[in-house]
Amino acid sequence: MNVKAMKKILLIAVIALTSVLTASAQKFALLDMEYILKNIPAYERANEQLNQVSKKWQAEVEALNTEAGTMYKNYQNEVVFLSQEQKKSRQDAIMKKEKEASDLKRKYFGPEGELFKKRESLMSPIQEEIYNTVKEIAELRGYSLVLDRASETAGIIFGSPKIDISNEVLQKLGYSN
């Protein structure tokens, strides 16, 4: 086969491939989740509720830590006057108080702690409603992919405002802006 014929075949293959890729072009949309959440009062209320309960629980943990610290200082001041048995008893009490504080901290703030559960119960309905609305808009408009402009992992450098559906999501959720 000569070079001219090979070039023609290659050109036809490239044109065919390009037309196939163009025909299956996907539509994309952007949204700004931070913007959407800031415009949903229920989200702001849930965040405030989480902050209040977090502060309350943190104060409980700090109170136990302070108590353990006070017990330790008292022990340090009186150690020379204590018998071995009294020393052991005080050390055990201090360690018990520190463990109590640590356990309480884990209970409230651990990976499966009360704060996590509270956040899940307050935020899940809001997130689910947003997701369903985004899905509905995407299916209606034929978007194959909707990216979050606010997400650090999305890696969006530029997004045209023409494809940003944030306001439409808010409008469908009943929050006009």
Language model segments and positions:
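Sec/Tat signal peptide C-region and signal peptidase I cleavage site
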Residues: 21-25
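Positively charged n-region of N-terminal signal peptides that target proteins for export
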Residues: 1-9
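Bacterial N-terminal signal peptides
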Residues: 12-20
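Amphipathic, charged alpha-helical segments and their helix-to-coil junctions
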Residues: 26-177
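General alpha-helical segment detector with a strong preference for membrane-spanning helices
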Residues: 11-12, 36
